[in-house]
Amino acid sequence: MTFPKISDVTNLDSSSLAEEILVIKRELFDLRLKRATRQDFQPHLFKHSKHRLAQLLTVEKSRTKSTM
């Protein structure tokens, strides 16, 4: 599984961007919960989810800065 490209994120509108951020945060929470309860999980998904979240937050921040 490869990392998602930032060009995919820049094409999203503001509402879907905010929705995607919530989805990724929920995925990270679920992964942490699985790790804490010693359930089966794929550790590489932490890195992928964090990378995706960083991309989403970067685009969101740049959009809010550009409107100021």
From Swiss-Prot:
Keywords: Chloroplast, Plastid, Ribonucleoprotein, Ribosomal protein. Pfam families: Ribosomal_L29. Gene3D superfamilies: 1.10.287.310. InterPro entries: Ribosomal_protein_uL29, Ribosomal_uL29, Ribosomal_uL29_CS, Ribosomal_uL29_sf. Coiled coil: none annotated. GO terms for molecular function: structural constituent of ribosome. It comes from the Eukaryota. It is found in: Plastid, Chloroplast. HAMAP family: Ribosomal_uL29. Belongs to the universal ribosomal protein uL29 family. This is Large ribosomal subunit protein uL29c. It comes from Pyropia yezoensis (Susabi-nori).
